[in-house]
Amino acid sequence: MKIFISIILLAIGVYFIQPIWSEFLSVPGTFRGDGSERIVVFTADDCGVNCRDAINYLNRSGHAFEELVLDNNEQNLKLFQQLGGSDVVPYLSSGYQLVSGFYPQDYLSVLAAARGLAILDPAMKKVYTQHFDANKNSLLVMYGTSWCVDCAALREYCSVRKIQILDWDIELDADAAARYEMLGGRSYPLVFYGARRMTSFSPEALRRLMKI
């Protein structure tokens, strides 16, 4: 059973929903008043090229977002920490998605989740459609290997809880390997639930990814 605690921070206009499940307490997420995902990116004056590239990328996307600078701003720093931030900027939150650092393909996943697959070019749209069923419902998919420890942990977690997952071994499946490269995979497992992306496994991260 889900209990929702809503926190409205009027000073910056961000709507946070913090879910409490019986098994764990999640970090908050960033949402609009209507429940849609809201993109917030934290930066710092000394961040340099990574923060500039992140902001430029989001500006070019045309999608609304908020930049919150951490320098000399206790409120922004507190939010940053509440959302799981530590020592890496830029740090992006969109709904329950979190991205540490700037990786274009991670940001593209955030935008696709927020705006739909129509924003993708034909090649990337073809990749992302593999993460949905024929009725356009999100599928849980994993790009992994047979030897990856976290991949095995995710398989076991899903098996015990009867969570359906498409398990692609990129060392055996050439098509999956090609998609993994196009998606900018950097480690294993690379997990998607529809357009939403997860780059490492933990039970909390999976629940946040699937909003369950």
Which stretches of residues belong to each language-model region?
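Solvent-exposed, polar/charged alpha-helical surfaces in well-ordered, non-transmembrane soluble domains
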Residues: 52-60, 78, 105, 109, ...
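Local sequence-structure signature of Cys/Sec-based thiol-disulfide redox active-site neighborhoods
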Residues: 28-64, 127-163
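Non-catalytic, surface beta->alpha helical segment in thiol-disulfide oxidoreductase systems
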Residues: 94-123, 192-212
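Aromatic-capped interface at the extracytoplasmic side
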Residues: 20-28
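Hydrophobic membrane-insertion alpha-helices, especially the h-region
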Residues: 2-20
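Thioredoxin-like thiol-disulfide oxidoreductase module
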Residues: 68-87, 168-187, 210-212
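Mid-chain, structured segments of secreted extracytoplasmic proteins
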Residues: 75-98, 102-105
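Solvent-exposed loop/turn segments at secondary-structure junctions
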Residues: 46-49, 72-75, 97-100, 146-149, ...
